[in-house]
């Protein structure tokens, strides 16, 4: 059951266009399923990549106050909303909101390899998501990505993932469905590339 404060925050996100149309409760249930698929250890540090309207980050913050969360988004408008939402939900002690380009922040010493896990709901293509996320993950970290309902064996090609530093992709069947990508080896120092390079020449 969603709290009135959380519903109000997500309704505002919806009115601002930060999340799509539909029932708020369905977004909350999806975020809780995302958290369940990730199964973070107590006190772990996680990043919500491209947090947008706070899905799943804000729900995770409410459900798991033991976690240290960083909500990352490049839009100043969305970041302003997230900062207000964090105060409204009284989760300021365990949530940091960061504005910036993921491809740049992943090379910042404050964030590179700093997280036990990365949540991602709708950041970009699988290739762009994997390339950006691995820069934020520590040596035993894990990326947990929301997946479309239809199965696509080519969505996460093993050789391409291994070249980045992931062990592969484990699919958590739902509904909803998620992909879990565990780090096997540290990424190269040039990973991730710039957005221009990522878009022009995707890795897969």
For every predicted segment, state its role:
Residues 155-204:
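SAM/dcSAM-binding transferase cores
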Residues 68-73:
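Conserved SAM-binding motif I beta-strand of class I
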Residues 140-149:
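Conserved beta-strand signature within the Rossmann-like core of class I S-adenosyl-L-methionine
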Residues 130-141:
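A short glycine-rich, Lys/Arg-flanked "PGG" loop and its adjoining helix->strand segment in the class I
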Residues 91-102:
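Conserved SAM-binding strand-loop segment of SAM-dependent methyltransferases
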Residues 103, 107-117:
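A short acidic, Gly/Pro-enriched loop at the edge of an enzyme's catalytic core
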Residues 53-66:
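Conserved SAM-binding loop of SAM-dependent methyltransferases across substrates and taxa
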Residues 1-47, 77, 84-90:
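Class I SAM-dependent transferase core
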């Amino acid at each position: 059951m969603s709290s009135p404060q959380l519903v109000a925050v997500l309704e505002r996100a919806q009115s601002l266009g930060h999340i799509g149309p539909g029932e708020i409760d369905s977004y909350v249930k999806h975020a809780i399923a995302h958290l369940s698929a990730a199964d973070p250890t107590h006190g772990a540090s996680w990043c919500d990549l491209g947090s947008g309207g706070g899905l799943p980050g804000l729900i995770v913050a409410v459900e798991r106050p033991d976690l240290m969360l960083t909500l990352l988004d490049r839009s100043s408008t969305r970041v302003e909303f997230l900062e207000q939402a964090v105060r409204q939900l009284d989760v300021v002690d365990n949530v940091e909101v960061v504005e910036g380009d993921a491809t740049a922040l992943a090379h910042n010493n404050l964030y590179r390899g700093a997280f036990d896990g990365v949540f991602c709901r709708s950041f970009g293509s699988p290739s762009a998501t994997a390339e950006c996320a691995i820069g934020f993950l520590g040596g035993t970290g894990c990326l947990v990505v929301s997946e479309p309902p239809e199965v696509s064996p080519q969505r996460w090609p093993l050789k391409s993932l291994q070249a980045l530093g992931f062990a592969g992709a484990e699919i958590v069947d739902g509904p909803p469905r998620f992909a879990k990508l565990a780090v096997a080896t540290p990424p190269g120092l040039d990973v991730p590339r710039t957005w221009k390079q990522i878009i022009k020449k995707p890795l897969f």
